[in-house]
């Protein structure tokens, strides 16, 4: 049984959490749970799970590599996490999805993989499928699912990868890139213009400090090379 991991405000990369569960659902029937923290391929079903670094479209990301089951039927590969979301905070699930390359000389192309994000609580008769995309993209495609309705609740968040409507599992190795839950309102990234403005302010303060005129956040330093200046311009959130 998965233990619930209480989340606080911040960015939680699911691939770094210890409470992952791997399973598969064959032909829409009962879920089959594999050994705790399973990694590799399952001989009976053909389903596979592995933590990898996947490069798609020139961008390398830590990812969970999966292949849907295909022996004795077809179905969905499922990676699940039990999470306790804090009350009063917004939350969103974010990830990137893609499938692997194939060798056209030796194997046919995948017709696509169906990526699904599902959430279940103790009150639900069945998991709610909040996101679904059937795709054969070999470059990263973003996923964003609002989890704010589950604030204050314990949930099982499941990432499913299946063969899609044709039930064709050929070359269906797929990736969940950097699956993440973001809790709370996060600072907005600075624009390039704002970064340049802060850089110019810091350089100006450092130059003044180099000649002994120290302002707030500026320092006059001395070493074997002589006297020089340094400066710090903190952001809206302070310094990290």
Region spans (language model):
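Gly-Asp-aromatic-enriched flexible segments
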Residues: 1-240
């Amino acid at each position: 049984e998965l233990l619930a991991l209480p989340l606080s405000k911040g960015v939680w990369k699911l691939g770094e959490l210890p409470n992952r569960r791997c399973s598969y659902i064959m032909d829409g029937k009962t879920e089959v749970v594999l050994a705790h923290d399973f990694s590799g391929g399952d001989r009976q079903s053909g389903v596979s799970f592995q933590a990898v670094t996947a490069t798609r479209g020139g961008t390398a990301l830590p990812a969970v590599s999966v292949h849907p089951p295909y022996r004795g039927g077809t179905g969905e590969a499922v990676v699940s996490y039990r999470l306790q979301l804090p009350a009063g905070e917004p939350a969103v699930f974010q990830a990137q999805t893609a499938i692997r390359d194939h060798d056209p000389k030796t194997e046919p192309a995948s017709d696509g993989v169906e990526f699904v994000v599902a959430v279940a609580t103790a009150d639900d008769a069945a998991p709610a499928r909040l996101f679904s995309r059937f795709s054969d993209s070999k470059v990263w495609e973003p996923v964003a699912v609002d989890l704010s309705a589950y604030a204050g609740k314990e949930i099982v968040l499941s990432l499913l990868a299946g063969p899609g409507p044709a039930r064709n599992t050929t070359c269906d190795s797929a990736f969940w890139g950097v699956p993440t839950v973001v809790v709370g309102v996060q600072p907005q990234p600075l624009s390039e213009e704002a970064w340049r403005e802060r850089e110019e302010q810091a350089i100006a303060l450092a130059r003044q400090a180099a000649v002994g005129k120290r302002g707030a956040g500026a320092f006059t330093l001395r070493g074997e090379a002589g006297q020089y200046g340094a400066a710090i311009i903190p952001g809206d959130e302070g310094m990290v």
